């Protein structure tokens, strides 16, 4: 036993109290850090508004901390006598601080019903029993509300009766109101609202005001436990206030004083309090939704930071509870055990009434999702807003999206889109698709009236924008309202003004991506051309949708040239390539090249090369394109005096005619320039030339062999200018025929159109359908391949859909069960076995497709075309 003779009686009492709580005088071993990062739910810490408070405190300390800061503390100290009564459930921390610091003996007044902790009758019954049976003289009642962990508020009647109880027995009533501003139950009409004891007219009740006190601190409502600053409110006991204030005047730091003063006098204090309540409610909803989803019983709360729940219903003893606590800790979760609260020691947890937990799990799941999304939204528009804008929405030239955040954002967006598809009513899904045209036309109107350009100098009202643009104010307001609801433009409700956001800024006429050209061209002429799609589907129609819309037989290249639209088309396509370059740079490990050179074939104006060279300054690169493109690109890389511009170290430019498709041709062309190609990287969306350069033109060739149609196969240079007359983008396949009646020339391009034309001319219905039902199925699946699924980028999704279709009983082919049709030819090239290999997947994961592809490959016409296809043009 240590020698205590040198200690005062007070110190001896304090030491004995500490030992009672397990503290030892021996030196403790240095604590070891856990290798895990646990979720710590064991401490009542309020983190909901910590980012806002941290910002406020940092600014305060930078501007206000100096040598002359005065300290006027109002400490939260309870210097009680030798006994006090406390209502429970209460945290074990109360026992420690009252016993060690104030050296009083707490007497618990157990709560009989945890669901109705502050029932006036039950509360008074418990207080009376504790007072009458206490082995110590009672001097005060400490009432904590809203309480930890129940999160319930005292009713007005309970507070009045408690005050009267104390007055009749000459006791002090100490109301712990540290959660006073954390009441979030206002939306619940049946919830008991928070009322402070100081809001009552206690004199009218005949109570002694000098014996009623309120304790409050910064620790809970504002999550500032580290400031160690609080206050005691005693309206009629100046002697008590003096006794508390003077002895503790040196115990409050200047930092705590500065931060607390800044917060409590801030003009934003009401907003911070409101935000705190809002976020606490969201967190509470998320917690109880999870509990309900798993059938866990809990006590509904309306205030504070805790939810009291029966996580281990099988636990009957303290040892059971401790064992469960250890299992949670091993799993990475720390939480306060029920034995940390006085009531649990007395078995009060057995009186938790089961909630009516719904058997249906969808509602709590949606609550969890909603609360999580609301919290994410608050973070993304609040403390994370600056990082979000910098990482994902900085579209200045050469600026790249953060690769990791971009990937995470894309994954999240995909999930949200899937959730939207699952939850959105079908009528709204159709409305969204149907009204998409309206959204596009509103966007076109904003570009046409130069609204993004007019907002460059700052926010403007609708009337100001209307005056500057020449638009009608009322209709312009309708257009802008629709656009800002879709994330384009930013609106200040207080000042009723619009301003550019990162999205609308990209529509400025001087923006390097030239998005305004895309909107203008595709949102007007291309959308107008789309109106011809229904008419183009009719059998016997030879005009394309664009020709139908413009009522012309000219190819679109000739028509665009005649209308003077071709320069704008080139600017649009060039701007699009430039806009895509940052994404390509972010997606691929260009640093693997080190200081070696690479060749960008068909690189246009060199946007990709420019970005790569700026990011990786030791890398060298070459641009391979037509002479006219090279001459234009040269001006972008070289300054007038011949020095390299800011775009980087471009060591060589070469040009070549013709359309290079195979790796062998790439190596030949590079060899002529003195380069040696050591590595060829395939970009996302690019396809292996030797196996897939013929992927489209084999479709009509197979049908021609199946129908035994006499034909002449011509191999042409698609880069030649004359080919614009055949195809507006100089692509293959295209076919030329003669009308059997008028002898007029017939030109058809695009593989699906070629299939349909050949079938219309030479098929008896075998490949297109012999009756209405068959024709409908063939037409639908053929159109779906090109219109809905796309060509390259959606292969995996396409295969999943085909697998589901072909897995049906007796469904040996796509459109019809018993025979192939042009629908099978439409899908077949993209479902060849080597396509699966190219994308790094196993065709055996799609067994129905594998069986179907083998049936198609076994057809003589398919074998004949597949044998000749790779050699065409090589």
Curated annotation (Swiss-Prot):
**Segments of this protein annotated with the region Glutathione S-transferase ataG:** 669-874
Any Gene Ontology biological process: secondary metabolite biosynthetic process
Q: What class of enzyme is it?
A: transferase
List keywords of the entry alphabetically: Methyltransferase, Multifunctional enzyme, S-adenosyl-L-methionine, Transferase
Residue span, GST N-terminal domain: 699-766
Q: Which SUPFAM superfamilies match?
A: GST C-terminal domain-like, PLP-dependent transferases, S-adenosyl-L-methionine-dependent methyltransferases, Thioredoxin-like, Winged helix' DNA-binding domain
Give the molecular function GO annotations. glutathione transferase activity; O-methyltransferase activity; protein dimerization activity; pyridoxal phosphate binding
* Residue span of region Aminotransferase ataI: 1-339
Q: What does this protein do?
A: Trimodular acetylaranotin synthesis protein; part of the gene cluster that mediates the biosynthesis of acetylaranotin, a member of the epipolythiodioxopiperazine (ETP) class of toxins characterized by a disulfide-bridged cyclic dipeptide. The first step of acetylaranotin biosynthesis is performed by the NRPS ataP which produces diketopiperazine cyclo-L-Phe-L-Phe via the condensation of 2 phenylalanines (L-Phe). The ataC domain of ataTC then catalyzes the formation of bishydroxylation of cyclo-L-Phe-L-Phe.
Protein family (similarity comment): In the N-terminal section; belongs to the class-I pyridoxal-phosphate-dependent aminotransferase family. In the 2nd section; belongs to the class I-like SAM-binding methyltransferase superfamily. Cation-independent O-methyltransferase family.
The protein's name in its UniProt record: Trimodular acetylaranotin synthesis protein ataIMG
| Encoding gene per record | ataIMG
